[in-house]
Amino acid sequence: MAVPKKKTSKGKRNQRHATWKGKAAVAAEKALSIGKSVLTGRAQGFVYPMNETSEEEAD
């Protein structure tokens, strides 16, 4: 069975943790930006379903 030979240092652990947290922060910022653009109606980079109930009620 494979086992690590030595304990990972706190510095290496913190470095990996910081990388993970940084990637999560970038993803969260991007999601927030996309959400804001959808709410303001300025989203042009993707297609999302519109509410069809309002069109049916108008007819």
UniProtKB/Swiss-Prot annotation:
Keywords: Ribonucleoprotein, Ribosomal protein
One GO molecular-function entry: structural constituent of ribosome
InterPro entries in the cross-refs: Ribosomal_bL32 (IPR002677), Ribosomal_bL32_plant/cyanobact (IPR044958), Ribosomal_zn-bd (IPR011332)
Chain intervals for the UniProt region annotation (Disordered): 1-22
GO terms (BP aspect): translation
Pfam families for the chain: Ribosomal_L32p
Annotated SUPFAM superfamilies: Zn-binding ribosomal proteins
Family: Belongs to the bacterial ribosomal protein bL32 family.
Protein name: Large ribosomal subunit protein bL32
Source organism: Prochlorococcus marinus (strain NATL2A)
Phylogenetic placement of the source organism: Bacteria, Bacillati, Cyanobacteriota, Cyanophyceae, Synechococcales
